[in-house]
């Protein structure tokens, strides 16, 4: 992923409230547009980098269950 894109996404949401971040995520998912996927990936990268090992395990379990449901 281009480093400029990563920085642009982070700069675009830096300082946003939890409500604004949630709106950004929900809007990106509901739009269904593939052009939103890199931005969601950057946000997930930030989450992952700041998550505890317990949080990571929970996310992986949730992901695994979600993929089984598809």
Swiss-Prot record:
Q: Which InterPro entries match?
A: SspI
Question: Which GO BP annotation is one of this protein's?
Answer: sporulation resulting in formation of a cellular spore
Please give the chief subcellular localization of this protein.
other
List all disulphide bridges recorded for this chain.
Answer: none
Localization annotation: Spore core
Instruction: Write the record's keywords in alphabetical order, separated by commas.
Output: Sporulation
Cite the HAMAP family for this sequence.
SspI
Give the similarity note.
Answer: Belongs to the SspI family.
Name this protein carries in UniProt = Small, acid-soluble spore protein I
Origin organism is Bacillus licheniformis (strain ATCC 14580 / DSM 13 / JCM 2505 / CCUG 7422 / NBRC 12200 / NCIMB 9375 / NCTC 10341 / NRRL NRS-1264 / Gibson 46)
Gene giving rise to this polypeptide: sspI
């Amino acid at each position: 992923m281009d480093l400029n894109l990563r920085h642009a996404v982070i700069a675009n949401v830096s300082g946003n409230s939890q409500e604004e971040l949630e709106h950004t995520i929900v809007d990106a998912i509901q739009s269904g547009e593939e052009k939103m996927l890199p931005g969601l990936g950057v946000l997930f990268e930030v989450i992952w980098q700041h998550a505890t090992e317990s949080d990571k395990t929970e996310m992986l379990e949730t992901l695994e269950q979600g993929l089984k449901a598809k």
